[in-house]
Structures are given as structure tokens and as C-alpha cells.
Amino acid sequence: MVSLHSYLIVSAILFSIGTIGVLVRRNAIVIFMCVEMMLNAVNLTFIALSRHLGNIDGQIFVFFVMTVAAAEAAVGLALMIAFYKNRESIDVEDVKLMKL
């Protein structure tokens, strides 16, 4: 059986990779994928702690996080498509050029 410590280490590594990706990359799709990776790392932590403590609350919270992530994915991809149609680029540096 895999220990709680191992799950938390994997979760921390995934979260760190996602954070580095958000800070370093300029492509909006890659940044979006890194944010999703960070959410999945948090979900892994919730599941591991829920299993370790014998409580189902963490697993229920993961379903809420997944629901919010799905809504975020829909809105984020719609914004990226609209931005691509406008600028023909998905570089986040180009977002600064847009005016309201």
C-alpha cells in the first residue's frame, strides 16, 4: 500500500510543475493546462487525506472542484478562441495590447 507521504510528495511535485509552467510559459493554452495540473494536484491531496483520515468530505470536495474546473475550461477555451479570432495569436503578451 502506498503511504500518505508518497501521495503528498507526488501532489507537491505536480503543483510545483504547474506553478513553474504558469510563471514561465507565454502560450495561453499551456498556461491553461498548467492551471488544470495544479487543480489536479490539489484534488490528489484531498483524495489522499480523505482516504487516510477515513472521511468522505475530501472526496465530495473534489467533485465540486472538478465541476468548477469544467466550467473554467469552457469559459477559458471560449475566451481563447475569441482572442485568437481577434489577434490570430494566443500569446499572453498580446493580451496587454487589448483595450476595453
Curated annotation (Swiss-Prot):
The chain crosses the membrane at residues 4-24, 29-49, 60-80. It is found in: Cell inner membrane. It is a multi-pass membrane protein. Its EC number is 7.1.1.-. It catalyses: a quinone + NADH + 5 H(+)(in) = a quinol + NAD(+) + 4 H(+)(out). GO terms for cellular component: NADH dehydrogenase complex; plasma membrane. Its main location: membrane. One of its GO terms (biological process) is ATP synthesis coupled electron transport. It comes from the Bacteria. Keywords: Cell inner membrane, Cell membrane, Membrane, NAD, Quinone, Translocase, Transmembrane, Transmembrane helix, Transport, Ubiquinone. The keyword Cell inner membrane applies. The keyword Translocase applies. Belongs to the complex I subunit 4L family. This is NADH-quinone oxidoreductase subunit K 1. It comes from Geobacter sulfurreducens (strain ATCC 51573 / DSM 12127 / PCA). The lineage of its organism: Bacteria, Pseudomonadati, Thermodesulfobacteriota, Desulfuromonadia, Geobacterales. The gene is nuoK1.
